[in-house]
Amino acid sequence: ALRQTENAVREALEERGYSEIITPAVEYFDVFAQANPELDQDQMLKIIDKSGRICVARPDNTTPIARIAATRLDDAALPVRLYYSQKVFRSVSGDHGHKGEFLQVGAEFIGADGLAADKDILSAAFAALSRTGVDNFRIELGHAEIYKALIEELGADEASAEGIRRLIENKSFAALGDALQPFGSKPAAKALGAMP
């Protein structure tokens, strides 16, 4: 079933002009630490290469795709539509049946912004999900600036802000409610509590 779902998504994206990109499974730690400081470094699976440099098993797909786009696709006609279907690796505390290896399928629309770009990627996501045969799905939109603005409005200290971010990311809604309780009925607390 997993392979059929993956193939259905691939077909839908390719029909919309998205090309597959495959990135290295092992990258230098610095690629992720500098480009995406929001990634939890404690969850990265670290490897030391023979020259002593710290490498990681790919914890995310967007960061290496952005690196490749910036270094190897700089003369490509814009916009560039890419999709990936590859595993990411993260250290999972307590295991709980998870082995730290997750298939991640997604798409990147590079070189344009605004409403037309948003429409393109959202219609591709809708088509891909529809193709899988699932008829009851929800598309969640995330933008780091929304979260940052709400945290600033909330007046949370750095430790509280990081804790709230992780709870939202992990969809730990009961714990999120507890973490937001000290902020009372502030509109920013209500908005953060309603984030998907």
Describe the predicted segments one by one:
Residues 1-63, 67-196:
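Extended, charged alpha-beta segments that form solvent-exposed binding/catalytic grooves
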